[in-house]
Amino acid sequence: MIETVLFDLDNTLLDFDRAEHEALRQTLLHLCGYAPEEMLRRYNAINRAQWKLLEQGKLTRHEVKLRRFALLFDEFDIRVSVKKAARQYEALLGIGHYYMEGAEEVLKTLAPCYGLYIVTNGTASVQQGRIGSAGLRQWVRDIFISEEIGFDKPNPAYFEACFARIPGLQRQKTVIV
């Protein structure tokens, strides 16, 4: 019988793609005065590639945050501060939350019966902001953010650190969604 459920945050509970798109669109509009869909799509590809490099240990989290904008701005010949863009984008992303369809109802239903936890990669300030603005803390017992844990998913060390912080965890009675 299942007792513990670990939910991934991005695109499981909250629609990260939508929040990312809106934060990027607002950042580009503010700093550049325009935000064409082509540029937004290209950012997504560049950003995913940078996070893959982080997971492979080839970049640091700080490098990812800046490099994704540096590459985008070089490609589109934009002369805007990469650091300023990264700061504004993260601030906007930190308040952007849109529930995935049915996620809120699932949490409300499961919370009284199971130990619910959030497991997520990402920047602590952004993820904490999104979790807080979405009101997710009311349903979960703890939140495990890779930047705070010191390892990124899917590294087994990340999950070992999470499991060690869950009182009385029985792995055979635990699922990850």
Tell me what each language-model feature is.
Residues 1-3, 114-115, 172-173:
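Short coil/turn segments at beta-strand junctions that form active-site/ligand-binding loops
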Residues 22, 26, 71, 75, ...:
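Residue-level signal for well-ordered alpha-helical scaffold segments within enzymatic catalytic domains
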Residues 81, 138-142, 170-175:
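Short acidic capping loops at alpha-helix termini that bridge into adjacent secondary structure
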Residues 152-177:
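Conserved Lys-Pro-Asp/Glu-containing loop-to-beta segment of HAD-superfamily phosphomonoesterases
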